[in-house]
């Protein structure tokens, strides 16, 4: 088996809004992420909370931010995410808001890096909380074994007394050279102690 290349890890979700209580795990849906550098992460996050118009314009069913606390590639690294019921809605939503044409209050707080749409390959439950994220290169011939292994790992961790632990494996749609041949693995719990 070819070795896996870990690119970026460790993202902690600061804030999110989504109705996820007892949400089912599903491979339906898609996510968009806008990767940015924020000079003042707290101020940018607060501005997003107070001005949800960008999220509302895209038709998202849930949205939030994740801040990279370790393994970051640049200072102020964070992403703004949005959840959609399907890939089509995510792609169409991306045409309804242009982050490069954002109001000045947003532009002055962040530097855009790139955006990408993600499709889950394994059943995933949207329950924002504490997250660890890895971007991994997996050869195509090993993809099924890799996803099955992560599903078994999730079941084992849940059986060991952590029922709110979830893994998700996502494939990028777009994202340019930043996410090419990369899977995103998100391991999520309600908090770091869970």
Regions found by a protein language model. Give the residues of each.
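Sec-dependent signal peptide recognition
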Residues: 2-7
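Hydrophobic h-region of N-terminal signal peptides that target proteins for export
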Residues: 9-18
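Short S/T/G/P-rich N-terminal loop/turn motif that feeds into the first structured element of a domain
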Residues: 18-194
């Amino acid at each position: 088996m070819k070795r896996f290349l870990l690119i970026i890890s460790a993202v902690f979700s600061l804030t999110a809004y989504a109705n996820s209580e007892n949400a089912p795990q599903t491979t339906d849906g898609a996510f968009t992420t806008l990767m940015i550098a924020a000079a003042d992460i707290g101020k940018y996050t607060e501005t997003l909370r107070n001005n949800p118009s960008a999220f509302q314009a895209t038709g998202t069913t849930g949205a939030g931010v994740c801040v990279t606390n370790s393994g970051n590639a640049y200072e102020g690294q964070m992403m703004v995410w949005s959840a959609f019921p399907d890939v089509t809605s995510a792609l169409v939503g991306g045409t309804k808001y242009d982050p490069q044409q954002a109001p000045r209050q947003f532009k002055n707080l962040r530097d855009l890096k790139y955006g990408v749409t993600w499709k889950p390959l394994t059943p995933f439950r949207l329950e924002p909380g504490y997250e660890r994220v890895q971007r991994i290169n997996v050869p195509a011939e090993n993809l099924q074994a890799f996803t099955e292994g992560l599903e078994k790992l999730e079941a084992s961790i849940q059986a060991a007394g952590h029922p709110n632990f979830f893994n998700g494996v996502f494939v990028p749609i777009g994202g340019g050279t930043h996410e090419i041949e990369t899977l995103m693995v998100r391991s999520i719990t309600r908090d770091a102690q869970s």
